[in-house]
Regions:
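Carbohydrate-interacting/catalytic domains
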Residues: 4-128
């Protein structure tokens, strides 16, 4: 499908069932989540993670050191297993995936990360 002009694009973006509308709504949702997290502040600490080749990841920490976020993306077209030990999560904290809005259970040893999926794992989720 080739969208030829702005008006046509805007119609597709308004349609919640169109591929463009779905992507647009997800981008807005992610921007809102990201904007609410202190660890995503421009002056927050950031380090890249040393992960297997199938993943790209980085760790961010808020300036007050109260929030950490591990951002990990599966760069392949196959499901990959991410071991919890690869992230060095602090065990006495509750960790959540901001994008899935789910708690990471303390007994979990690994996550199955779908192709091209991204995780934002945090110890201190701020409400959107």
């Amino acid at each position: 499908m080739c969208i030829r002009d702005r008006a046509e694009l805007e119609e597709h973006l308004k349609d919640a069932t169109s591929p463009q509308g779905k992507i647009y709504r997800e981008l807005i949702r992610r921007i809102q989540i990201r904007s609410a997290q202190p660890a995503f502040h421009p002056h927050a600490t950031q380090f890249t993670l040393q992960l297997r080749e199938c993943f790209f990841g980085f760790w961010r920490q808020s300036r007050d050191r109260q929030q950490s976020i591990f951002c990990v993306s599966n760069l392949t077209n196959e499901e990959q297993i991410l071991e919890v030990t690869e992230l060095n999560l602090i065990k006495n904290q509750v960790w959540r995936d901001l994008l899935r809005e789910s708690v990471v259970e303390s007994y979990q040893r690994a996550w199955a990360v779908k192709p091209y999926r991204t995780l934002w794992i945090t110890n201190s989720a701020k409400a959107v």
